[in-house]
Amino acid sequence: MAPPPPPTRCLPVLLLLLLVVAPLLAHGRRPFISDGGNANANANASVLRLPSAAAAAGEDMGCEMSYGFLPCTTTAWGNLFLVLAYGFLMFKSATYLSSGSEMLLQILGPGIVGGLFLPILGALPDALLILVSGLSGTKEVAQSQVLIGMGLLAGSTVMLLTLLWGSCVVVGKCDLSENSTAIDSRDTKGFSLLGSGVSTDKQTSYAARIMAISILPFIIVQIPKIFKLHSGHQITVLIGLIVAALLLLSYCLYQVFQPWIQRRRLEYTRLKHVMSGLLRHAQKHSIGRLLDDEGRPNVSVIEKLFHRIDQDNDGKLERGELQAFIVGINFEDIDWNSNLAADQVMADFDTSRNHFIEKGEFVNGMLRWLDEAKRTVTSGAYSKKFLNDFHARTRDEQTGLLDKDEEEGEADGNPTWTCIKAILLLLLGTAMAAASADPLVDAVHNFSNATHIPSFFISFIVMPLATNSSEAVSAIIFASRKKKRTLSLTFSEVYGGVTMNNTLCLAVFLALVYVRGLTWDFSSEVLIILLVCIIMGLFTSFRTDFPLWTCFVAFLLYPLSLIMVYILDYKFGWS
């Protein structure tokens, strides 16, 4: 077995990631020049415009072309198309950053890289969008566009703690026992508000407490507004910036020296790889195919596989029989012993907790795994290659250790090659995020002007979908496994994402406000962030069991947040 590459092979290249962003942002935008004479230009700007000789000569076209060549328009439909196009690019960049981060974490393990670099890279798309929202143009233009950054910051936090949190409760609900604890994989009470729900572990509540503490910088910058002070706004912005940066550093160092958060992510991806390996082996050695051409599970083949594993023919699988089957798989591409793998499968399949896997439990467990494999790998043909692709994807997220399987290829199991692939994904994701952030902000701003919808509401609703939808889909898929452990890992990721929003993204926003001398006038926006974080933070910090009715509390907070901003800004004149 080849040892994993030392961190020094990957660390220098990771340092370059921070240097890649600066040149892209420094040369990405042209100064915004407006003389107020856009009436004629606007009348002629009904289509997407490409650069022309007139543009090269500096003629005003009514809209600003990012990088001097990307199309622009002043119409609502044209800008909607641009928002969707650039939003998709931002979505792909977030996907690449997430995949590269997971792969690198598996190779290097918990430590400096996993604690310092990877959390920052995960929040990079949001941070870049916030940065470019007020980076260029006059002070007045920056003051107008920076509201897009605040909308993204508030929308991302609120979406994670309301829509995503509530969705995970709905799809992950199980029957609650007499002591209100969820029973893994048992969901017979339907949508009973009190009889079904989810449970998490204590460490998940610790992550929620860290998230609640991270709102401190928001409170600091609001002090002049709270006490109606006429001076000291810039000082409090600077203090808030310093506190946010210190909290970010503390959070990262905490993960380095107490790496339980990283280990939870590591455990999460390893479980996915064991699942994919068992499915692939079952496909190869079962009598028939596990899926037909339409992707429907073949229950008879799954039952034949059960009888093959059941060596004593007593109609149930003992742990020893399961371990013997796993030993036959010969996991050469994963640093895992058969005892641990058998424990993982027993915990996932044995829903009755009688230390046996009955035929019904085995069939249901295989059906869940196959369903998750279908949702993870988008393949047109459900052949053997389908499960091979699923296994390859989870292996890339796993250890990168040497793989001797002939079908997978020699290079895929090489840890050095996996490290290079992870870094390339990170570089590609960073470059895409840096390149598409500026055009996306411009498109949102122009769409707001064309439709007369405040840019805050557009960025609050639309932009978090571009930067967080990949993680949201993954979280919902794994919450649907209806296990306390996977739900705990899922909620920990949600709370970690909010913590990075409240530290890194807020620090970027405050730095932008302070350096450019912008006015801090975001009381209503900060208020909804504080309310949602405090309500959900207190709610999740001191309890581990959540009945189904709690999801409606989370869901209601989302529209209430939008309504509150509208009333405070447009009825009471807060902004």
From Swiss-Prot:
Residues 297-332, 337-372 form the EF-hand domain. CDD domains: EFh (cd00051). Keywords: Antiport, Calcium, Calcium transport, Cell membrane, Glycoprotein, Ion transport, Membrane, Metal-binding, Repeat, Sodium, Sodium transport, Stress response, Transmembrane, Transmembrane helix, Transport. GO terms for biological process: calcium ion transmembrane transport; intracellular calcium ion homeostasis; sodium ion transport. It is a multi-pass membrane protein. GO terms for molecular function: calcium ion binding; calcium:proton antiporter activity. Its main location: membrane. InterPro entries: CaH_exchang, EF-hand-dom_pair, EF_Hand_1_Ca_BS, EF_hand_dom, NaCa_Exmemb, NCX_ion-bd_dom_sf. GO terms for cellular component: plasma membrane; vacuolar membrane. It is found in: Cell membrane. Ca(2+) 2 binds at D350, S352, N354, E361. Pfam families: EF-hand_7, Na_Ca_ex. The chain crosses the membrane at residues 69-89, 112-132, 146-166, 210-230, 237-257, 417-437, 457-477, 494-514, 522-542, 548-568. Ca(2+) 1 binds at D310, D312, D314, K316, E321. This is Sodium/calcium exchanger NCL2. It comes from Oryza sativa subsp. japonica.
